[in-house]
């Protein structure tokens, strides 16, 4: 599980370099803000396109093989990127990363996690996966940013950082091949159903319900990206302090995800997801009406902590619904691909919505509307999780 968690973190380091190294990336490639955003957009579009096919492949190949190939191929592309090629080549690399990261890794990672634990411990399995991802994300980010600063913080230093990332990918790919179990009897059965799996999965109401849960929860995850500017622009906090709050919430991820997994196995997955949506609704509704006065700063920070815990708890358990809804193990990858293609569409529309609202309604109003929309979507997620509880646990959907 430690290797799965680390793999699930490391694989996203290269495509999302701009999150930690925004200006160094622009300087190295000589690109504008729009061009920088296009790099991530190309990766996102390729990822969405490859979720279903990647999941289908995950049902036909050993997760160990796919995870290893994903890490190694992504790392090799990273070595090319460390030379800072022309912008068209950089776009091509990001498009290929969409295939090597999402198409190869995601479905295999979810399937390997499901196979790792028995049915009654699925909450723990996915909770520990997300906890491992959160812990390694925070630790690696802190370490590598410090190394970057120590190397001089310039373009040559950034090239070395990219090479370190690439080396880490390749090395972890080799370790994953040696450590991850070669497979379970379920996956090694000879029964295969071809592309008809997509039709079978599409007929399962549970798949659409889980996709709704993931999508609405992921909208809340996108809402968390706006906590930093919300704190600085609405409450007048300094950028440094607001950024520190944002960085601090990252360390909540491993604790919240692991705890949610343990609780979910005790009280039920869908019950835990539903409770999380109740918390998210109350929290984001609070953001939507909270005036930006100095006397309410402590309440605002407390609400950020509460919302972050609920968001990270959800990320730790919502794919455990695959077992609770009795999705056939042979279709885990295909179902994951379809769910992810729908569930992660907020990557496309949430930043556009946020930008439009903040530009159209400057000041607190834009944030209040944005957070209000997320509160409303949390109700949709709550209804989906309650429907799963009413139908999915008693019978295979």
Enumerate the predicted regions with their spans.
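Juxtamembrane intracellular "pre-TM" segments in multi-pass secondary transporters
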Residues: 182-210
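Cytoplasmic helix-loop-helix junction between adjacent transmembrane helices
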Residues: 93-132
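Conserved MFS/SLC helix-loop-helix module at the cytosolic interface between two early adjacent transmembrane helices
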Residues: 49-88
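Cytoplasmic membrane-interface "Motif A"-like loop-to-helix N-cap segments
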Residues: 60-71, 265-278
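Glycine-rich segments within core transmembrane alpha-helices of 12-TM secondary carriers
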Residues: 123-148, 340-351
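C-terminal membrane-cytosol helix-exit motif in multi-pass small-molecule transporters
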Residues: 145, 166-187, 384-389
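C-terminal ends and interior cores of transmembrane alpha-helices
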Residues: 72-86, 279-294
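Extracytoplasmic gate region of multi-pass secondary transporters
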Residues: 18-22, 141, 204-257, 315, ...
């Amino acid at each position: 599980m430690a290797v799965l968690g680390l793999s699930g973190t490391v694989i996203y380091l290269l495509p999302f370099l701009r999150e930690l190294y925004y200006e160094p990336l622009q300087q190295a490639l000589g690109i504008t803000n729009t061009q920088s955003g296009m790099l991530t957009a190309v990766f996102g579009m390729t990822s969405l396109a490859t979720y279903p096919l990647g999941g289908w492949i995950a049902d036909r190949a050993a997760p160990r093989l796919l995870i290893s190939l994903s890490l190694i191929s992504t790392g090799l592309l990273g070595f090319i990127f460390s030379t800072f090629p022309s912008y068209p080549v950089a776009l091509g690399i990001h498009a290929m990363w969409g295939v090597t990261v999402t198409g190869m890794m995601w479905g295999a990672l979810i399937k390997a996690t499901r196979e790792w634990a028995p049915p009654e411990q699925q909450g723990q399995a996915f909770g520990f996966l997300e906890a491992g991802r959160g812990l390694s994300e925070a630790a690696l980010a802190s370490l590598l940013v410090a190394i970057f600063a120590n190397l001089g913080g310039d373009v040559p230093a950034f090239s070395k950082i990219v090479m370190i990332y690439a080396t880490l990918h390749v090395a972890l790919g080799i370790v994953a091949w040696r450590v991850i179990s070669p497979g379970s009897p379920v996956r090694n059965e000879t029964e295969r159903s071809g592309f008809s799996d997509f039709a079978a999965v599409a007929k399962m109401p549970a798949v659409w319900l889980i996709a709704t849960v993931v999508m609405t929860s992921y909208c809340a995850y996108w809402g968390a990206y706006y906590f930093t500017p919300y704190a600085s622009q609405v409450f007048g906090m300094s950028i440094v302090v607001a950024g520190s709050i944002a960085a601090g919430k990252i360390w909540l991820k491993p604790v919240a995800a692991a705890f949610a997994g343990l609780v979910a196995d005790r009280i039920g997955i869908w019950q835990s997801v539903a409770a999380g949506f109740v918390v998210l609704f109350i929290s984001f509704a609070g953001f939507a009406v909270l005036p930006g006065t100095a006397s309410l700063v402590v309440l605002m920070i407390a609400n950020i902590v509460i919302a972050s815990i609920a968001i990270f708890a959800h990320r730790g358990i919502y794919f455990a619904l695959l077992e609770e809804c009795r999705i056939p193990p042979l279709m885990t990858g295909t179902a994951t691909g379809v769910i992810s293609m729908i569930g992660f569409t907020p990557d496309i529309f949430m930043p556009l919505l946020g930008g439009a609202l903040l530009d159209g309604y400057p000041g607190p109003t834009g944030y209040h509307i944005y957070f209000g929309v997320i509160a409303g979507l949390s109700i949709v997620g709550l209804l989906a999780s309650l429907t799963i509880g009413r139908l999915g646990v008693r019978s295979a959907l």
